[in-house]
Amino acid sequence: MNYANLIDDTNLHADALESDIVDLCNEAKEIGSASVCVNPDYIELCKKLLNGTNVKVCTVIGFPLGSMTTESKVFEAADAIKKGADEVDMVINISKLKDHHDEYVKNEISRIKEACGNRVLKVILECCLLSDEEIVRACKLSKEAKADFVKTSTGFSKHGATVKDVKLMRQTVG
């Protein structure tokens, strides 16, 4: 089985150079990745480099902390779509979730999904900062808000995904 078409080739480093992104796109084309995930300022470059391929362009919003306003995230998402993003990875507002502001969290995801239109929206939970109960709530809120996927982590916090987190998320969203 070819697993390459399940991979999001990613470079979200603050110091990523244009040459790094060119290399990322070339690698994605070579192995047949599902997408490249880059910071928003590289969307248009990636669209140009990946034109004529099946590799999608994904970007991040509210990254990596998730603590900006809903309005900022909605603007970022709409701008990313306008620039050509096929997929958007948003970081959930962790503080709002922890403070049990569930309607805020659900509304934010819903508004960003609306800004994305028919594009894929993935919600990053940052599981290493959440309790099991918070992971379950975040998954349920994401599903209710019509997000397409939930993801475990940004890769920029304490640690990344754990098998336990993935199992819990899978049990919750199906």
Residue locations for each model-derived region?
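Calponin-homology-like cytoskeleton-binding modules
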Residues: V38
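Alpha/beta enzyme core
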Residues: M1-I31, D41-F63, S67-G174
